[in-house]
């Protein structure tokens, strides 16, 4: 994220609307589809704003090599990757520091939600491929990954759902756009398990006051109610389609 005080880009207009016409607490359009990869144990595709991300889940299976096994529970290995064509400037192939950090925090968030104790010595691989990037890819990828895990039939305590909020032109806004992410004052990605309210991912880039932080997190929690329903609808739609096809 680029934070610059010299930037003169105005991100909020005189009508208190953002550059894309949204109000402060309005989400970008979100579409999720489950079961999109035939050879994966579970999969999902998400479009969130301009983001396009596909997720494949493989496992639980015996962890290999054996020294990577945990005798008490499964190990969740998320691999987040941005395709070379996913951003305007061509990205060098292979993992970098950012993708490794995002892979780690997604692995930890998913591990909190999965009943990993049911699968000792196993591993669950989660491949997250960003086909098109438009701000908030870690949260969009995580939100799709939990749908893919459910599609794989892996038992979970709850599905993980997240969103971002941030500070733009002095205002707290929900679900940052690419321009807001690049030129805003702060970005706060957050993910929770809705049933318990447990926070499984929370980061911040930039500066906000304590009141602004609570405003941002409250805005995210409210938004997750809508996103959670989109997740569940994706799974219901998949099984509805399978039921129709099975009855033919």
Swiss-Prot record:
EC number: 3.1.13.-
Molecular function as annotated in GO: 3'-5'-RNA exonuclease activity; RNA binding
Keyword Cytoplasm: yes
Domain of life: Archaea
Keywords noted in UniProt: Cytoplasm, Exonuclease, Exosome, Hydrolase, Nuclease
EC class (word): hydrolase
GO cellular component, one term: cytoplasmic exosome (RNase complex)
Function: Catalytic component of the exosome, which is a complex involved in RNA degradation. Has 3'->5' exoribonuclease activity. Can also synthesize heteromeric RNA-tails.
PANTHER family (UniProt xref): EXOSOME COMPLEX COMPONENT, EXOSOME COMPLEX COMPONENT RRP41
Protein name: Exosome complex component Rrp41
Organism: Thermoplasma volcanium (strain ATCC 51530 / DSM 4299 / JCM 9571 / NBRC 15438 / GSS1)
Organism placement in taxonomy: Archaea, Methanobacteriati, Thermoplasmatota, Thermoplasmata, Thermoplasmatales
